[in-house]
Curated annotation (Swiss-Prot):
This protein's UniProt keywords: ATP-binding, Coenzyme A biosynthesis, Cytoplasm, Magnesium, Nucleotide-binding, Nucleotidyltransferase, Transferase
Organism, as annotated: Vibrio atlanticus (strain LGP32)
NCBIfam families on file: coaD_prev_kdtB, cyt_tran_rel
Catalytic function, reaction form: (R)-4'-phosphopantetheine + ATP + H(+) = 3'-dephospho-CoA + diphosphate
Subcellular location: Cytoplasm
One GO term (biological process): coenzyme A biosynthetic process
GO molecular function: ATP binding; pantetheine-phosphate adenylyltransferase activity
Role played: Reversibly transfers an adenylyl group from ATP to 4'-phosphopantetheine, yielding dephospho-CoA (dPCoA) and pyrophosphate.
Protein name as it appears in the record: Phosphopantetheine adenylyltransferase
This protein's record includes keyword Nucleotide-binding: yes
Subunit structure: Homohexamer.
Coiled-coil spans in chain: none
Site positions per UniProt: Transition state stabilizer: 17
InterPro entries in alphabetical order: Cyt_trans-like, PPAT, Rossmann-like_a/b/a_fold
Length: 162
């Protein structure tokens, strides 16, 4: 069984992430969404909240599971019996960053391959950082995130402001 992992922080998950998840799910027998703890990043949502939002977002995709993880991605891939990492590339800056990561992953686990997918055109500009910034400054984000995520972001931002 070909198992792939799509790792990320997903803070929050965007329509761009979900588009990539749906496309990758068609390519593999099983796709594991690896939600990284990322202690070095200040996140809007906790790891458990991000996992829950992704599970709610992906509930219609039977071959997709969502798992939180901390530590090295290559160790998580080994735990999940995954042989492929799926990564999204929006810009040349993404490519440079991902190329460095892929080189390190190959050193740590040579049998782990990376598959890079470019976003659908309507999502090429979209990032979690932009969504958070727009939401924090009172902008409307409904068109950029799944419905359950929109509600959660609005509630979280409102709670921070109170």
């Amino acid at each position: 069984m070909k198992i792939a992992i799509y790792p990320g922080t997903f803070d929050p998950v965007t329509n761009g992430h979900y588009d990539l998840i749906k496309r990758a799910a068609c390519m593999f027998e099983k796709l594991v969404i690896g939600v990284a703890e990322s202690p070095s990043k200040a996140t809007l949502f906790s790891l458990d909240e991000r996992v829950a939002l992704l599970r709610e977002t992906c509930y219609e995709l039977p071959n997709v599971s969502v798992e939180g993880f901390s530590g090295l991605l290559v160790d998580f891939a080994t735990e999940q019996n995954a042989s492929i990492l799926v990564r999204g590339l929006r810009t040349t800056m993404d490519f440079e960053y991902e190329f460095g990561l892929t080189t390190m992953y190959r050193r740590l686990k040579p049998e782990l391959e990376s598959l890079f997918l470019t976003p659908s055109e309507e999502f090429a500009f979209l990032s979690s950082t932009l969504v958070r910034e727009v939401a924090i400054h009172g902008g409307e984000i409904e068109q950029f995130v799944p419905g359950c995520v929109h509600q959660a972001v609005v509630a979280k931002v409102k709670a921070f402001k109170n």
